[in-house]
Regions:
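Acidic side chains
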Residues: 8, 102-104, 192
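A generic fold-level signal
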Residues: 20, 58, 97-98, 188-191
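Glycine-enriched catalytic-core subsegment of oxygenase/oxidase enzymes
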Residues: 177, 183-194
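Predominantly a Rossmann-like dinucleotide-binding segment in NAD(P)-dependent oxidoreductases
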Residues: 34, 42-181
Length: 194
């Protein structure tokens, strides 16, 4: 709509969530001649911006190659397996949902685009099947209202934190968004090892 009104558009990623809507946006660009910029907010964090400044100022010389690894621990990483991201049909997986920020950071830091990118992944820790292989026998769908969640170090107890309760648990009746699903439940199809 903004392009039809003569405006260029700046969008946070993702610009849309499916192929048909993406095609509508591309058609609007072709039809109106307007511009679209999809941005990544993470590049503007203070440490990311400082890295760019250091590289631009030649602090380590000319960069010829980048090997970039991001280790996502089970404290922050588990969150992706509690929420909507856990189903690859919703998120495209962490290589799409999370790693796009990492690719953008490298492009931002060295003011260049890659000639080759390689990535791979597998699901080896989270999900019911992997938990069963490790001997887990207590399963539950979500933490709230589940006695089986007691003692699970990965359980997110929304009701025990006033801020989380107000932000998320109390809003479920309106948005249906569950943030406390079991990371060892069924329906997890994204990779946890990349």
């Amino acid at each position: 709509r903004a392009m039809e009104l003569g405006c260029d558009v700046i969008s946070e990623k993702p610009m849309t969530v499916d192929e048909a809507k993406c095609q509508e946006i591309l058609d609007a660009i072709a039809r109106t001649g307007r511009k679209l910029r999809v941005t990544f907010n993470y590049r503007y964090s203070p440490h990311a911006t400082r890295i760019r400044e250091l590289l631009r100022d030649g602090a380590i010389g000319t960069v010829h190659q980048v090997h970039f690894e991001w280790v996502l621990d089970t404290i922050h990483g588990a969150d992706y397996f509690r929420r909507w991201h856990r189903d690859k049909r919703n998120s495209g997986g962490l290589l799409v949902h999370k790693a796009t920020h990492h690719f953008d950071l490298v492009n931002f830091w060295i003011a260049s685009r890659p000639k080759t990118v390689f990535a791979f992944g597998d699901l080896v820790f989270y999900g019911r099947e992997n938990a069963e292989r490790r001997g887990v026998t207590r399963f539950y769908s979500r933490v709230h209202g589940s006695p089986q969640a007691a003692g699970d170090p990965f359980a997110l107890h929304l009701a025990q934190n006033a801020a989380l309760k107000a932000l998320y648990l109390d809003a479920e009746k309106d948005d249906g968004y569950l943030r406390d699903q079991s990371v060892f439940g069924d329906g997890i199809s994204i990779e946890d090892t990349m």
